[in-house]
Amino acid sequence: MTAETVALSAPNDSADGTGLPVRPLPIGAFPLPLGYLLVPAGADTEAARLDLLAGRLPTTWPDRMAAHRLVVEGDQDAALAALTGDDPVSRFNRFVLDPAGGTPETLRADLGELGVLVDVVAFTVGVAAEPPVDGAATGEVGALVLCARATHALADGDAAGAVDLLDAAVSLCEGSTPVLAAVLRGAAAGAEQQRAATPTDGVVDRLEAALRGLDEARDMRVARSETHLAAGLALHEQGRTDRAIPHYHAALRLVTSAEAPLVWASAHANLAAAYLTAPMTQASDQLRTGIAVQSLRSALTVYTRADHPTEWASAQLNLANSLVYSPSTHQADNLVEAVELYEEVLEVRSRDEDPMGRARVLANQGNVLAHLGMFDVAKAKLYDARFVFEEFGDVEAVRTVRGVLDEIARQQALRRSED
């Protein structure tokens, strides 16, 4: 059953716009504030309501939805100023844009069966500390009540309870508002992963079901991209990189760095990590390393040392490692850049806070310096790394560093014999 067929079963014939909105309401799927603005009833707004239900922005906004249009354009002050009516829908929409104004008690009463949405909005924007409880709310309204309660449960550490609430929310609205149900499935996947402390098959199933529900929601590209990224990360952590990679690519096709910079950067960084860890079975697979290098460079246009230190350091380190092994006609230049990248990472990898992480960077940097023939500097880095590995009992790492040091000794002996 589609959103359109459900909507058409309830004719929208309140032309003056003073009555309550026609259900199902297109709420909850788009992000705040647009996602909670009610659509005034009337023949002039019906096409827009159906578009929003399907996850699409209207190509033409009716005059009575000027506030919605202005919100989409990013002018919330103008949107608030456009809501001059005293009918319940206009007052509710003003409350969404300015929760500090108005009288919630009167508004709640005037909205009738939709009154609980006042409490949903108040909780969602942080005005109310507790979520509403309304067992009589149905459909998409009841789903949003349960979603608010799930958010509260997660904040209290009750991930299992949140999963149950979100599953119940999906059941309430999947027949009438499938796009909202898809968004809630994605939220349930996140709660399930938090409950299990790992991405289970159930997490992946929920995310892929959410993506199917969002497939035609053309103007919810950020939500679709976020869901693809979440699915990719879950599959990647399960070791199924072959299935994770298409999700990362899909996430990148949907958004730009300007629209969703952190989603875009994360998709690039994790796509690179997937390519770098995937087994290489044929010569053409080496091209993946070059793609990984480009993706990491892209991620680092968003991740900065000041604003995203953890992600920045990870991308820097992976880029350095990629440059070492990437096939190139400028291999020496790549190695020099890798040494510099390692040095920048070492500046934020404290010996006290992350001794083993720092030691691994030192070992990698020492190895590259050795390949560049800078043996004395390389040995200093490698000795430092070996000391930490020995202290923490990492026998394999100690053996690897000793192997590099032995090779340096052989190369230095060879140089002396040639002199």
Language-model features, listed with the residues they occupy:
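TPR-repeat structural position
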Residues: 76-77, 104, 159, 197-200, ...
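Structural motif corresponding to the intra-repeat A-B loop/turn of tetratricopeptide repeats
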Residues: 73-74, 101, 156, 195-197, ...
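Structural signature of alpha-solenoid helical repeat scaffolds
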Residues: 137, 175-176, 219, 259, ...
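TPR/TPR-like (Sel1-like) alpha-helical repeat modules
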Residues: 85-89, 109-117, 288-297, 336-343, ...
